Amino acid sequence: MSVASLPLRALNIATQGANILGTLLIVGLVVIICTDVLGRNLFDAPLSGVPEMISLSIVAIVFLQVPQALRAGRLTRSDGLIDSLHRSRPRLASGMELLFDLLGCLVVSAIIYAHWPILIKSITRNEFVGAVGNFTMPTWPAKLMILIGATLLALQFIARIIQRLKKGHIQ
């Protein structure tokens, strides 16, 4: 293994770890929702805070899992145009792929830049969701997961850009 591939390997391991964490959150939500449904129907006692937990977790799950989707080439997109361009005009298609990665990195970087103060405010003000005395949950863990996922996504875009330029697809 070359020294140059170590950062990419570390990025891919971190990306896979975030994906696994997102999957574990999904499993946790399934357990919580099933427990809530059983509690409502069998004991007329719903589980407190389920809507709050779900609303915070869904966004965190998306941000934790989208870097792996990009890495695996499974990010949702329309391939019809780009596939036909790869056959007829490969340089143009490669340029469009590079442009997609650059714009993706730019947009995700803007999200990171805008989200950082939101995370800091959430931590310093001890923000929470729910009703005091019934159920409260801090918001910062979900916001931290969003920041981690967005950072991994930006780094995956950068890795794709570097790989495209190394392969010489753009001349």
What does each model-found stretch correspond to?
Residues M1-Q171:
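Alpha-helical transmembrane segments and membrane-interface helix-loop junctions
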